[in-house]
Structures are given as C-alpha cells and as structure tokens.
C-alpha cells in the first residue's frame, strides 16, 4: 500500500478516474517490475545483466504514441528481435502495466472505505486457509444435502471488459484493454478458448487473477449474501480482494435480486439453513432441508451463467448428493459426514424405552492416493509409492538435503494436523524419509545399508516421525488440561496463507 500512496494522492485530486494516461508513464512499469513474477521481460541482455532496463520502457512508450502500433499481425509476432522490436515482448510489458493501472482506483476506494489497517486486523484469521474448516465442522454436521460446484470458465472477453466498465469510467482505457485482449487472442488463434486462458494466466498471472476476481465478484454479487444482512447485492467493500476465503452466514429475509440483463426477477425462497462456501474456483452449497430448494439454487446458477455471462453449463454437471453418502475434495482434504449411532435406555416409572440417537460428525480425511501421485510427480517416489532418490539435490550438502526433506515433511504434517486420522500420514513420512536416505546414499556413492551404518545418520532422520504432540509438550506441560485437550482434538492453524505444492485439488 505504501508504494501506491503517491499515485493514490494524485488520483484523489481528480474528479474522475482517468487511467489511460498512466499507461504512458515510466513509473508504472517500474512498479510492475517490482511486482512481476517473470522479471526477465524487463531485462536487457537476459542472463548477463539482470538490471531493470529503463531504455526498453522508453522505447515502448515512444512506439505506443505511434498510430496503430498496438494492432499487431501474426507476421509481426515472428519478427527478429535483433533487427527491431519484439511485439510479444511489448505485449507482455503492456499487460504488466495494465495490471498495475487497473488496481489503482480500487486501492483508492479500499483505502477510503477501510480505516487504513484497523478493519483489516479483524480479517486476519479469515485469511488463513484453515479458517474454513472450523466453519464446516460447526455448520455442516447439521446439514443433509451438499452440492459441489466448480465455477465455469472461461468468460467472454467482451463481458469481462463490461464488468470492469461498471466500476471505472474511463472509455479510452477500456478501448485499449479490449484491443489488447483481442489482439492477444488473435496471436494464439490456433488455441481453443481454455488453452488461451491457460496461456494468458501463465504469461501475466497478476492481470489474469485480477480479471478473474472481477468475474467471480460479479457473479457473487447476485447470489452470495453478506454475513450480517441481505440486500440488493452490489459489493461496495473491496476487502474481498484481501480475504482468501469467503463464507457467508444464514439468510434471514426474503430477497429479490435484480439482474441488469434479465427480463425477469429472480426470487429466492427463504431457507434459514443453507450455506455457501467458496474457495478459488470451487463453491459448495449445503442445506438441511429437502433438495427442492437446492434444485432451485441449481437452476439459478445455470441461468445466471448462461444468460448473464454467456457460459454454457449443463444441469447434469451440478449434482445434489446426501451429505452422509457423498465425500467431496476441498483444499487437499476429503470431507464427508460420518453417522455415529447409539442406543440410550430411558426409564419412566415402570416403563423402559430404547431411544436410538444419531450424531453426525464431520470426517476430514487425508487423501493418501492423491498425495502419493503428487510425490511421484515431484520425483520422490514412483506411481506405486515406492521411494526413489532425488539426484537433482545430490549436489547440495548433507545438511541442506536433510533440511529440504524435513521442511516438506513438517509442512505436510502442519497442514494435515486437522485430519481425523493422522496415522495415515505415516506412509507419506516413510516415503520422504527413505527418499532422503536414498538421495544421500546416491550422493556418497554407497548403498542405503552402508549409509545407515554411519554414526548419527539414523538418529538425525528420526525427526521425520516427530509427533505434533511432542512439539506441544515443549510448550505446555503434559499434565496440563490444555495439552490433554490438544492431544485429543484436531488442531487448525490460522497462519497458513497458502498450501504446499503437493497439496492440490484435482
């Protein structure tokens, strides 16, 4: 926020948001360079002098002033960079500038709506990935039906630009953005639409994520309700871009939602026990009542995507399943509801009754098979789960090799400490431990048995099986009530802002 302060002050002094002139300012591309994940596009003589080249930006801005420079044909894209400019390189730099410029008015609105960082302090716990699981444990154990929905994509480019135009009034900027997006699409015309989205997301992840957030924000502004109240939905607060997880509470009133492109009114029936959760590109809808209302919501989603966003979605792609019979994958876990039945004897005077009770518990399981596939993809084992050596790391020191394996193992243990069955992680720890031993043996050109005979090696590798409870015993005494409670229950951490690369949803 601090590095944008100068440009926010300039924007506040203006009556309207004029973003177009900012694309011709050198400091915008300097900010883009400082945030860019692929900084090589701003470098001159890549691999020799890794310094930000202001000359490249100046030449680009000069060419941008020329008429029809941004209209680039397919033949221009193959031009030799040594004999002239490279249009592909120019497009990547311009897209980085777009990503910085388009965020400025929203940062301005965010800084004015939030009292600097005071309100953001209350959202810190919600930013943790694990904050969603206590919510699921508290709510989903009382629900009966669930619908696991993947938000469809890609969205049409013109609709994407129109969504942005609703928030920012700057016609020249959006004409240029539309021209840039369509030209990029034409360069890759031999790709299908999904492949184009994949290519664009890799070439400029910052701009892609920003546009994708706007798409999700627009669709959720119609169907997703704020936690405290329901209203004619149009999101005003942009704290949505700071929270990684969005979950919303129960609905209390009848709500009518008006969509600008619909010729009819969407009316939502009151259901006090329906919940909506979204993370990344997946949303989960759960309800306690019969699946009638769930089918209503299902058709609302389908009609919205088809009529408002021009995205074809078939009804059979959204399934409504009993929560007790269906497990769904979320954030690297398998979740389902386990029914625990018990019989209670009740006696009243001389009569005795047997009462059967059913208690629902949310069962959160570590997905061992997907984890083994991830380990096999990372070359720690084969597809059958048999550990193999990691020759790429053999050039490092013994301490660095062991530290790398331990860091991966501890991160996985830290992430999956909320699982119902933690013993299933022993197989993952075994694979990493034996892979570490084989890597060290490969480095020293010896067998695994000969390496294990070395003094201290086996004791050092025992850290792979260090239990979380043993770590907690250093913080709390073993005879304390706090340690006993933590020893029995699962532990969710509110400091996990991103998942390990080995943890992913397929």
Curated annotation (Swiss-Prot):
Keyword Phosphoprotein appears in the UniProt entry: no
Keyword Ribonucleoprotein: no
Entries under InterPro entries matching the protein: Domain_X, Maturase_MatK, Maturase_MatK_N
Main location: plastid
Cell compartment(s), UniProt: Plastid, Chloroplast
Any one GO MF annotation of this record: RNA binding
GO biological process per UniProt: mRNA processing; RNA splicing; tRNA processing
UniProt KW keywords: Chloroplast, mRNA processing, Plastid, RNA-binding, tRNA processing
Example of a GO cellular component annotation carried by this entry: chloroplast
Recorded family membership: Belongs to the intron maturase 2 family. MatK subfamily.
Described purpose of this protein according to its UniProt entry: Usually encoded in the trnK tRNA gene intron. Probably assists in splicing its own and other chloroplast group II introns.
Protein name, entry field: Maturase K
Organism of origin: Lathyrus tingitanus
Gene field: matK
């Amino acid at each position: 926020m601090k590095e944008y302060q100068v440009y926010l002050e300039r924007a506040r002094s203006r009556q309207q948001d004029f973003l177009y002139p900012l694309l011709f300012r050198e400091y915008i591309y300097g900010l883009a360079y400082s945030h860019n994940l692929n900084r090589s596009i701003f470098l001159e003589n890549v691999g020799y002098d890794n310094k930000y080249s202001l000359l490249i930006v100046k030449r680009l801005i000069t060419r941008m002033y020329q008429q029809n420079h941004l209209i680039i044909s397919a033949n221009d894209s193959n031009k030799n960079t040594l004999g002239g400019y490279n249009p592909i390189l120019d497009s990547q730099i311009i897209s980085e500038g777009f990503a910085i410029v388009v965020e400025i008015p929203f940062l301005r609105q965010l800084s004015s709506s939030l009292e600097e960082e005071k309100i953001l302090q209350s959202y810190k716990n919600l930013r943790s990935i694990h904050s969603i699981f206590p919510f699921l444990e508290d709510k989903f154990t009382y629900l009966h039906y669930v619908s696991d929905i993947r938000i469809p994509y890609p969205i049409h480019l013109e609709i994407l630009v129109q969504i942005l135009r609703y928030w920012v009034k700057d016609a020249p900027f959006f004409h240029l953005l539309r021209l840039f997006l369509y030209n990029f699409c034409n360069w890759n015309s031999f790709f299908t639409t999904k492949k184009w989205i994949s290519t664009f997301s890799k070439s400029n992840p910052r701009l892609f994520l920003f546009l994708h957030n706007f798409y999700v924000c627009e669709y959720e502004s119609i169907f997703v309700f704020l936690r405290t109240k329901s209203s004619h939905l149009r999101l005003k607060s942009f704290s949505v871009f700071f929270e990684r997880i969005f979950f919303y509470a129960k609905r209390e009133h009848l709500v009518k939602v008006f969509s600008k492109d619909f010729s009819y009114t969407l009316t939502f029936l009151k259901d006090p026990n329906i919940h909506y959760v979204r993370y990344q590109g997946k949303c989960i809808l759960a309800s306690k009542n019969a699946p009638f209302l769930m089918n209503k919501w299902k058709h609302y989603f389908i009609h919205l995507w088809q009529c408002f966003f021009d995205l074809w979605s078939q009804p059979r792609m959204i399934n409504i399943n009993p929560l007790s019979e269906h497990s769904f994958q979320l954030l690297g876990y398998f979740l389902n509801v386990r029914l625990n039945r018990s019989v209670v004897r009740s006696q009243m005077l001389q009569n005795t009754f047997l009462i059967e009770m059913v208690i629902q518990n949310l069962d959160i399981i570590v997905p061992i098979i997907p984890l083994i596939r991830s380990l096999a993809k990372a070359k720690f084992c084969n597809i059958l789960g048999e550990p193999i050596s990691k020759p790429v790391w053999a050039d490092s020191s013994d301490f660095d090799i062991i530290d790398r394996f331990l860091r991966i193992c501890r991160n996985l243990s830290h992430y999956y400490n909320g699982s119902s069955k933690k013993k299933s992680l022993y197989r993952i720890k075994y694979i990493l431990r034996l892979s570490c031993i084989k890597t060290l043996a490969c480095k020293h050109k010896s067998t695994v048995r000969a390496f294990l005979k070395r003094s201290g090696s086996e004791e050092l590798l025992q850290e792979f099986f260090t239990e979380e409870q043993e770590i907690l015993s250093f913080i709390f005494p073993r005879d304390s009530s706090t340690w006993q409670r933590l020893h029995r229950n699962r532990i969710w951490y509110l400091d996990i802002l991103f998942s390990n690369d080995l943890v992913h949803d397929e």
